[in-house]
């Protein structure tokens, strides 16, 4: 028990949650646990894997392609698997019943993804199907949203060196189906999508948990399909050859595979490509067209009246100044340039520190044909010009403080910046508070009043207004230049047009609506995100290719990159905070027990190194539709549907996007009912689904209420920014963006808000995103991955108000963008601040979530009170995250499920 004493607030303890099951535990499931047998899947059975520390002898290797032999470790594991299977028979554990299973046999949600080690139709361990009734699982068990996907059931004997790292972690690569249909007709019949969710990098900085690196220059690849050697190949002919697991071709084993870097004998089974599915090569010369160029940053800064007036220019200059020492500069070659823009282009000639401290500004007013006055002094080495750069950044706000120009020539500035670094490549960083309104790429304010929330919204408000913003990205891709935008203004910015710059170059668009430097919360968010963005490691001259084994083909690609060919995605620079989705198709029957997918990323680092990152995954195959469903990954499927809906919203209409989401889900449920459910009863029939997919309807329902897709009038900049974010957002943040995580703070457990034994702040268990669980006297934190809302019940007792805010009257609580002030002597205030800080901690994205304090309505608040009217928009925004409810005129989740059931029973 914790030694911390829990403060009990009057009324707040004895009523809360009365009659409501804990989040994630349906009432009907509370005492039911499915059969538990340990799985032979690697990663779930650490104790079954013996140490592997010796090279197999030649007679232990495969003598011929048909006669595969195992290493000693594999033989031992095979024996253990057989023993487990035998024991299961003795324990009378059979395959879980299908839809005849009574409701009381529903497994606990935390067990859905746990394989029971039972043999599937192909006599190999497979995930088993556990049915649930969605309508009896209300509120939905949201704990499932934090569970890993159903495990990849790959027997250890299929790996050269069985280990936890032999198959790719779901952090790097997730497949929507962890049991691959053996033919296209079975995939089509299932109505489930087949796609990969790829996140090549897990952290903003590469030194955090890097994968193993091969530095000897040996890269072993298949002669035919060009896949890389991986833990799932087999050695044949006394180890002299290896059989490719992708195309089955026998390849010669190079002598260097059994030699160290110095040429001494070495154990091939200790090599990284054989032990680890995620690893890197230091690329040899044949993978390098030229010496990796220095990292180059060109800052295109809006210095027009808007940017000066709202403080964006001064905030940006200060942020760059403070972040110069954190710019990636591992090889001491990083270069920087600054281009100020209004109705003219203002270049700065920056001398080396040792030569002079006189910085010259050169104004080019001919924006139609801009030229570089002193090209060699425009882009300067950071190390050698550090003092002069700091001097310029300090003076920049003063130089333009009285600027009254309202024009912003972004198009000409982009062309000039691209011309400056066309030989090097690099990153153009645009910071703007003004709609481009002069020169090439000039944009107009669009009339939203008669178009928003109509079928024309996508074509007239969310489409690219000027072809320049798409065509320019082709030029950028050829010269290895990416574009990132930071748009911060109270005015219309046409995010829909400008976001194309980042979409096709590997960049990103960051949107700060209503920004003003007068609000410290706005400044804090911008500076923290801008600084993390600048300090983030990146890769230049990057290409990524996905390969599938025989029968599998990549068919569509989603994310921020330039698709050069049918399977090659090009990134002028690859950031560390984005993910990608590749759709796959099955072109021919798969005749093997397992299929394979490999992601290869060829890149240049800021260390002047050229590297190849390899991610390989093995997926069991099946001819059973029930096994396909039992191994489906609901979060990866939701991500894929999101990408398809974003595409539909931008190319067709928002209604079509919502229809796509709902129709996709309905087709899956209808197929499950028709093909998997054994017996049906009309009218009172339950809404059956498999446990591992039970959150998919909730996520689809939540996505239809997301700012990106929901019906109603949404400012086009906000909607375009939301669509842009969903395109590239890593999966775990996308899930929170769709279904917000809600914490009840007034009654949290004693340990919450304090550090645990590892120094990590303990968070309360999330509750369902529904106002029905909110008490009028409660305190709640809503986290939607972009913002935080601290909701104070309108009837909160004075003790709670005093402990949290240090105020005596609830009506004194500041509403809107505010940090939670420190209250001296209040332990509860410290705990709440600790929780907010913990929720904001991210080392894999640059997002810093602004906190909005919201006072809920009170029974004592006079009807029509001015304060209540002012708070209404903020309250509506906060409660729009409670997606299980009727928000903004939409169905509640219960009604949504009932509608689905009625459609399926027609």
Swiss-Prot record:
One of its GO terms (molecular function) is zinc ion binding. The gene is SEC242. The lineage of its organism: Eukaryota, Fungi, Dikarya, Ascomycota, Saccharomycotina. It is a peripheral membrane protein. It comes from the Eukaryota. Belongs to the SEC23/SEC24 family. SEC24 subfamily. Pfam families: Gelsolin (PF00626), Sec23_BS (PF08033), Sec23_helical (PF04815), Sec23_trunk (PF04811), zf-Sec23_Sec24 (PF04810). This is Protein transport protein SEC24-2. Residues 222-247 are annotated as: Zinc finger-like. It is found in: Cytoplasm; Cytoplasmic vesicle, COPII-coated vesicle membrane; Endoplasmic reticulum membrane; Golgi apparatus membrane. Keywords: Cytoplasm, Cytoplasmic vesicle, Endoplasmic reticulum, ER-Golgi transport, Golgi apparatus, Membrane, Metal-binding, Protein transport, Transport, Zinc. Gene3D superfamilies: beta-sandwich domain of Sec23/24, Sec23/Sec24 helical domain, Severin, von Willebrand factor, type A domain, Zn-finger domain of Sec23/24. It comes from Candida glabrata (strain ATCC 2001 / BCRC 20586 / JCM 3761 / NBRC 0622 / NRRL Y-65 / CBS 138) (Yeast). Component of the coat protein complex II (COPII) which promotes the formation of transport vesicles from the endoplasmic reticulum (ER). The coat has two main functions, the physical deformation of the endoplasmic reticulum membrane into vesicles and the selection of cargo molecules. InterPro entries: ADF-H/Gelsolin-like_dom_sf (IPR029006), Gelsolin-like_dom (IPR007123), Gelsolin-like_dom_sf (IPR036180), Sec23/24_helical_dom (IPR006900), Sec23/24_helical_dom_sf (IPR036175), Sec23/24_trunk_dom (IPR006896), Sec23_24_beta_S (IPR012990), SEC23_SEC24_subfamily (IPR050550).
